[in-house]
Amino acid sequence: MFLACGDALYDVFPGDSASSGQITLNATVGGSPLNVAIGMARLGLKTGYLTANSKDVLGQKLAKHLESNGVSTQFLAPSDLNTSLAMIALNEQGHPSYSFYLEGCADVSLSKEQCPEPSQFKAISLGSYSTVVQPCASTLAWFANEAKTSALIAYDPNIRPSIQPDRAVWQATVEKLGSIAHVMKLSDEDIAFLAPDSSIAEYAQSCLQLGPRWVFVTQGGEGSQVFGQNGEHFSVAAPKIDVKDTVGAGDTFQAA
């Protein structure tokens, strides 16, 4: 079985209303690792999802959404805390900006006691804000380290400065989880935040020095690159398409 673990929230898109004092809200199940889990399941892989999931109505619907997409919910740890929310605004190019409501919420409360036996998994994917918000961050780092000898560990930082604006926290997390992971995936935006004075190739090489076998870098409309521990380098151009929004694009790449 494959496992993704971490965020469990709703992406909330505010819309216009006929009244200036009202807005419409369109909420969609989200969370970067959760999107990865659904992507893997849609590719035909037996997949589970690990998170602390709220017992509230949003958490119940989130679990049903996972089930309807073929993702096992046996690793969802029930929580009395609320479901996290992300308010999303899209610019003219379809790129999102985020405002998160996470404090005291279920997904970031995951504890070691709620984690399954790691030896049952072939591969484990983790990343995003759940790796920097405590106590979940420490839990996932511990879990990945426990699993690294029996499962492939894939890590995507998926930087969210609006949640944790301190660059040093993200850098320390990348160093810690990069030393555990067998595969890393970053976006060009992640690299620009983590190392603004480095090129993509320079930063990818610094990540390889942490220990992963492969480092993948996505660049939106510019395509993607992969760097290998033995000096390999490949690049793939992106097809030309009409973009409505880019939410979840990197997660889809990670799942594949």
Predicted regions and their residues:
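Glycine-rich phosphate/adenosyl-contacting loop at the front of the ribokinase-like
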Residues: M1-S72, V243-K244
